[in-house]
C-alpha cells in the first residue's frame, strides 16, 4: 500500500476517533465547549510518532484558545482512546493546534464582497 495513502487513512481515522472521544469524555470543562469544537484536520508525521490535530472553534479567539488548552490537557484520554480503537504499531503523540483557516476564509470572503460592492458603486456612477 502506498505510504502516503496509508497516512491519509490513519489521519482520517484519528480525526474521527478524536471527534468520537470528544463526545464520550465526561469532563464538565469540556462538556460546555464540545458542541462548538470542530476537529478540522490531522497531520501524521512520516514515522507516525506525532499527530498534529488542528482544532477550529465556533466562537471568538479566546474561546478557541481555551478549547485547544483543554484538549491538550486531556490528550492522554484521546491517545488512549485512539490506541484502543485503531490497530497501529504505535499510537502517535497528539499535539493540538489552533486552526484559523475557517476564520481566515470568512474574512477574505468579506473583503472580496466589500471590493465587489465598491466596484459596483463605482460602475453605477
From Swiss-Prot:
Gene3D superfamilies given in the database record: 3.30.300.20
NCBIfam families, A to Z: rbfA
Compartments in which it is found: Cytoplasm
TM spans (from-to): none
Protein name: Ribosome-binding factor A
Gene that this polypeptide is encoded by: rbfA
Species: Thermosipho melanesiensis (strain DSM 12029 / CIP 104789 / BI429)
Family per record: Belongs to the RbfA family.
Listed GO CC annotations: cytosol
GO MF annotations in UniProt: ribosomal small subunit binding
InterPro entries recorded: KH_dom-like_a/b, RbfA, RbfA_dom_sf, Ribosome-bd_factorA_CS
Pfam families documented for this protein: RBFA (PF02033)
Quaternary state and interactors: Monomer. Binds 30S ribosomal subunits, but not 50S ribosomal subunits or 70S ribosomes.
Any one GO biological process: maturation of SSU-rRNA
Keyword Cytoplasm: yes
Biological function: One of several proteins that assist in the late maturation steps of the functional core of the 30S ribosomal subunit. Associates with free 30S ribosomal subunits (but not with 30S subunits that are part of 70S ribosomes or polysomes). Required for efficient processing of 16S rRNA. May interact with the 5'-terminal helix region of 16S rRNA.
Keywords: Cytoplasm, Ribosome biogenesis
Amino acid at each position: 500500500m502506498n505510504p502516503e495513502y496509508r497516512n491519509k487513512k490513519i489521519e482520517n481515522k484519528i480525526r474521527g476517533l478524536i471527534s468520537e472521544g470528544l463526545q464520550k469524555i465526561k469532563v464538565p470543562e469540556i462538556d460546555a465547549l464540545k458542541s462548538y469544537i470542530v476537529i478540522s484536520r490531522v497531520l501524521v508525521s512520516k514515522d507516525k510518532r506525532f499527530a498534529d490535530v488542528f482544532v477550529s472553534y465556533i466562537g471568538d479567539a479566546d474561546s478557541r484558545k481555551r478549547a485547544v488548552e483543554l484538549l491538550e490537557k486531556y490528550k492522554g484520554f484521546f491517545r488512549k482512546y485512539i490506541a484502543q480503537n485503531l490497530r497501529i504499531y504505535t499510537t502517535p503523540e497528539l499535539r493540538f493546534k489552533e486552526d484559523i483557516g475557517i476564520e481566515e476564509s470568512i474574512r477574505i470572503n468579506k473583503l472580496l464582497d466589500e471590493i465587489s460592492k465598491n466596484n459596483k458603486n463605482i460602475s453605477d456612477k
